[in-house]
């Protein structure tokens, strides 16, 4: 039974995960801006269901890439003194099918799914030139559209639905600069509201090839449990992220 899912998405909250030494004290009094396009090579596991039809999901990175029809993601950040505001946005669309057995009959199950995740956050930073701790609060907006089409010799059914909800989140991001051109970031958040629960965690390592750019690699987990009114989306995404941060000067 071929499994389907959603891929290369949420990022919800990579928020310039490898930005350069942002733990430094800002003495200029000016806003500093960064943007980070990135690619999340994620796997997906859990359950997706629309109406009476549900599918277990257990996808590796290669499976998700095969199913991905379109995806785009990126983040932006602004800092002034000890204050920070940031936003992360992800859109992905997947489609796949598989052969299944229905009480002695052979049929097919096709799923098309699109997802948008947008997460604005704001917070306060404490630290010095070597380390920094961001205390963050924000929102995670989800918009999901799923269509499950079951085809078999004697009957066919198609179930589709779209849901949107907002979760409140709180978390932290710890940044450490052990040497001048490298930085380590560890972060986590959790919350809920529109869904039963959501959480994410990631760690990243970045290097600065110039004063304008940081290149980074990270590993990220993002989970959500939404189960309301015959719409089920209980999944965990995890995988490597590759990104490049540009600093405006």
PLM region spans:
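Predominantly the C-terminal beta-signal and adjacent terminal strand-loop region
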Residues: 201-249
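Repeated loop/turn-to-beta-strand initiation elements of outer-membrane beta-barrel proteins
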Residues: 82-85, 130-133, 180-184, 212-215
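Short glycine/proline- and aromatic-enriched beta-strand/turn motifs that initiate or cap beta-hairpins
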Residues: 22-93, 177, 190, 243-249
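Residues on the lipid-exposed face of transmembrane beta-strands in outer-membrane beta-barrel proteins
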Residues: 35-37, 74-80, 120-124, 137-139, ...
């Amino acid at each position: 039974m071929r499994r389907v899912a959603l891929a290369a998405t949420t990022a919800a909250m990579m928020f310039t995960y490898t930005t350069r030494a942002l733990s430094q004290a800002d003495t200029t009094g000016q806003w500093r801006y960064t943007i980070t396009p990135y690619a999340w090579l994620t796997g997906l596991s859990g359950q997706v269901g629309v109406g009476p039809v549900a599918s277990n999901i257990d996808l590796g990175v290669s499976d998700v890439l095969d199913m991905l029809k379109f995806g785009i993601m990126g983040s932006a950040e602004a800092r002034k003194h000890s204050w920070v505001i940031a936003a992360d946005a992800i859109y992905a669309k997947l489609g796949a099918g598989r052969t299944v057995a229905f009480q002695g009959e052979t049929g097919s199950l096709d799923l098309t799914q699109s997802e948008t995740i947008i997460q604005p956050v704001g917070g306060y930073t404490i630290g010095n030139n070597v380390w920094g701790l961001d205390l963050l609060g924000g929102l995670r907006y989800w918009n999901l559209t799923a269509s499950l089409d079951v085809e078999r010799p004697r009957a066919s059914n198609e179930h589709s639905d779209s849901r949107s909800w907002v979760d409140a989140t709180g978390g932290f991001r710890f940044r450490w600069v052990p040497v001048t051109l490298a930085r380590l970031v560890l972060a986590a958040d959790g919350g809920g509201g529109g869904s039963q629960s959501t959480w994410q965690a990631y760690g990243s390592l970045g290097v600065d090839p110039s004063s304008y750019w940081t290149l980074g690699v990270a590993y990220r987990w993002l989970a959500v449990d939404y189960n309301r009114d015959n719409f089920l989306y209980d999944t965990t995404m995890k995988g490597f992220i590759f990104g490049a941060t540009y600093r405006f000067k």
